[in-house]
Amino acid sequence: MDRLERLVIRHTLRLPSPAGPAGEGDVAARQFDAALMSVGFKLSADALRTLSGLSEGTVVDTAVRTLATVRELAGDHVRHNVYFVDFPANVPDTFEFWMRCVTEALEDRKARPGIIAQLRTGVINLLTLPSYGNYRHTYDEMLAAHDELTAAVGDRLTVLHLGGPLGDEVTALYLALAGSTTPLGDEHLADLGVLAEHCADGPQPVEIPVRENRAVVNAARLKAGSLPLLDTVTDVLRLACALSDGDVSLQEPTRFRKLSRLVRRALLAGLDDVVAQAPAKLADVLLHREAFKRLGERLHPHEYPRWPHAAEVFAVARGEQKAHSFDGRVEALFGADDVTGAARLLASAPGKLFRSLDRLLRSAATQEERDAVVAAVERVAPEVSGRVVLSVREYLHNRAEETGRKRVFINRAGRAHVTDDTRHAVPEEERKRLMAALDAETARRLPSPERLLVDPDVLDVALPLSGRATAAGLGVLPRGSLSPVDGELLRFFVYWKQKQRVTDYDLSALLLDARYDTVSWLSYTNLRDVEGEHSGDITNAPDGASEFIDLRLGAVRGMYIVPQVNIYSGERFEEAEESFFGFMLREAEQKGQPFEPRTVRMKSELRGPGRVALPLAFRRAEDGSWQAKWLHLYLKGEPEHNRVEGNQVTVATLLRGIVEREQLTVGYLTELMANAGTEVATWDAASVPQEPVTYIGLERPEGLHPDSVVITPENLRDLIPE
């Protein structure tokens, strides 16, 4: 049950109500609260009150489990050492430091011959210098070199609110994730799998709209002896991927495991039933022909003649049977320049119509055809998922400005690339008509609370139209979001622990001006500059390693700061035993250790593809303040030796494409609700309403009526209308 409790706390920042005998636990509860505050967390008043009425043993057990969970959330579950023992003080000039390493190597009897040989060639490999890349002191020695952190008003204090009994909290979390209207990230999908197995015999969501989520739930249902929920052949393919711990999004090939006879029968029966009810769905096989071929090798459909329709699936995959695809019919109409016919046919598949909208508008040669396209969209909009409606609305909003510029493509795994935009412009009048229609459709679906309280800081948070546009962690917001940054010192950190091979990750920060040209950078090749310091290069992490960059925001030249993690050598982010990135904010006079959990504002896992990670960027506003712009991007990079110097042009181009693209935000939805008659008011913590309200903010405030509807980043997906 400890694992389930950790999931609830991580996802909801709610502490399940502990089960235990009554007692006098007030002293232990206060000590628990104090321990939480040392790592940037705090018990809500209700949680503290409830714990105080339980036995001391119950409180202590709860504290031990909870502290372990929140320390991991903040990145405090590992030891963060630094190369330069008193970082950020006394960081040397880069050349001075390298010369010192060479001098020490020449004084080393073992290293001396090799260094002299390298000096004769004029090139020295830093990794051959004994004092380079490895810690020269213990963790305890590093701690002794730093003053204690002085508390400040700006330190993070994340409140843990009291939840219900653990069983109720687990069920609620399962229903929320399974019924999400947006795809979940890989970490949340894995959590859904754990919850689905635990909740297989309990309440189930009325609907599971996202296919990837359905696959994970189906895998749990099958293991529990229940029938899977299937209505397309692709549902069966995704289920097979889930059972093999593969990619349920079908973006990457899955190596199918040997399946038991029971599972093979269930999958074949599912395929047979889907095709028997709707033979046209055989066309979906063509989209994933190779995957179905590989699945057929595991299912042995020839051994089960009672399911002949299942055999047809694999016959289509092998090319032995024809299946006329819907997409083929659409292409034939486009080929005949019949835009009206294409729009009419696509209207029978509303999602495909919305995804083909740009092409339809560009292909329409007459006003009659353009009117037909708009009319088709208006007619079927109520049948399209809210996520797709909002995605197309955002796309149309940016379409006019993007024409002729660079296009940024980001796949579902977060890998990004840039290309020229060679598309023709779409008709402006129709673009505006469609935007108005989608606004009206979204407004129709939104709730209509009498009163909505909004934290102003949440208005610039991008709508989570895909869970894959974010990452698991603390304080993480969806890609494209803007959030305020307050503090004199901005400190980045990366931690990694290699699994099998020597692995070297390099933390860097690129500084760009208003035109996205390079001003400077901080990395192991430039340890110190006007803006700040680098903690030193660590090149091997068998027991884990950390690197830091300290920046004085007031001294930063330029407009943008782009931290990045480059894989210089070794294991990919997905291969390492553990890897995460984050940033801290503090005032100069606070001092403290290089890593102080209560100053951590954001910590996220590094688990994407590619060899260069770009978690977020920081930009200076016109008034001189700073904001974080959330990216969650990965660049393919080079197989080895990735450095900030080698990717600065690509990073600048990507950043420009994202910064100049306007996202649909929470502010967009609240404006629609206000226009529909909801009273929207700015949250004022000084006057908490007594009656139930709907609240949207970055954190759940204390004192709200228990029947209030509360939306925070942890459940922001609930804001997306179905």
What would you call each of these model-derived segments?
Residues 1-722:
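Intrinsic-disorder/low-complexity signal
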